[in-house]
Amino acid sequence: MAKVSKRLKALRSSVEANKLYAIDEAIALVKKAATAKFDESVDVSFNLGVDPRKSDQVIRGSVVLPKGTGKTTRVAVFTQGANAEAAKEAGADIVGFEDLAAEIKAGNLNFDVVIASPDAMRIVGQLGTILGPRGLMPNPKVGTVTPNVAEAVKNAKAGQVQYRTDKAGIVHATIGRASFAEADLKENFDALLDAIVKAKPAAAKGQYLKKVAVSSTMGLGIRVDTSSVNN
C-alpha cells in the first residue's frame, strides 16, 4: 500500500468527511490546503441534472470571469483583411489564414485558444483532426467563431473560460488561482454558476444543480452545500 504523505494527512485532517460546506467556507479551505510549491489552480465541478446522452441536454458555453483566470492566454486567430488588423490591435498573439493552417499542420501549436471569422472556417475545418482532440476547434457556441474577432480576442485575454458537460453530466472549470483573494474566487464562481444556470436546457427535469465541489490542483475536493450558492 502506498504511503500517505504528511502533507496529504494534514489536508485530510482539516476537512470533515461527508460534510457539505458553505461556498465561502469551501473556498477558504481550498486556499488553506493549497500548499504546493506553485500557484495551484482552483477548480470547480458542477454535477447537473441533465442527460448528456441527449443532444438537447448537452450544455456548452463560455463566460468571462470578472477577476480573470490568473493565466496568460495565447490566442491564435484565423481571419484576413481588416479583421486581421483588428485582431492584432485587440492583442492576438498569432493572426493568419492559409499560412497559419500550414504552421499548425507542421506541428506549431503555441497557443491556448483558436478564434476564427466565419469566412475562415473552410480552412479551419481541414484542421479538425489536429485541433479537435486538443479542445481547440473554434465553435460558435463558445464565441470562438464570430465576425467580431476583436471582441473574442479581448474576451479570451480577459479571462474567458469555456465549459461543457462531460459524459457523466458534470461541468469542470477553473475559477482562478490559489493566490487569488477569497472574494475574487467567489466572484468568479458566481459568474460561472450564473452562466451555467442560464444555460439550463428546457428538456432538463428535476433538480438541476445536484452536487458542487471545489478543489485545487494538488488539494482535496471540498463538497459544497448547494443551498449556500446563489442559483
Curated annotation (Swiss-Prot):
GO biological process, one term: regulation of translation
InterPro entries: Ribosom_uL1_bac-type, Ribosomal_uL1, Ribosomal_uL1-like, Ribosomal_uL1/biogenesis, Ribosomal_uL1_3-a/b-sand, Ribosomal_uL1_CS
Example of a GO MF term: rRNA binding
Xref: PROSITE patterns: RIBOSOMAL_L1 (PS01199)
Key words, A-Z: Repressor, Ribonucleoprotein, Ribosomal protein, RNA-binding, rRNA-binding, Translation regulation, tRNA-binding
Any one annotated GO CC term: cytosolic large ribosomal subunit
Subunit structure: Part of the 50S ribosomal subunit.
Family (UniProt): Belongs to the universal ribosomal protein uL1 family.
HAMAP family named among the record's database cross-references: Ribosomal_uL1_B (MF_01318_B)
Function according to Swiss-Prot or TrEMBL: Binds directly to 23S rRNA. The L1 stalk is quite mobile in the ribosome, and is involved in E site tRNA release.
Protein name: Large ribosomal subunit protein uL1
Species of origin: Neisseria meningitidis serogroup C (strain 053442)
GN (gene name): rplA
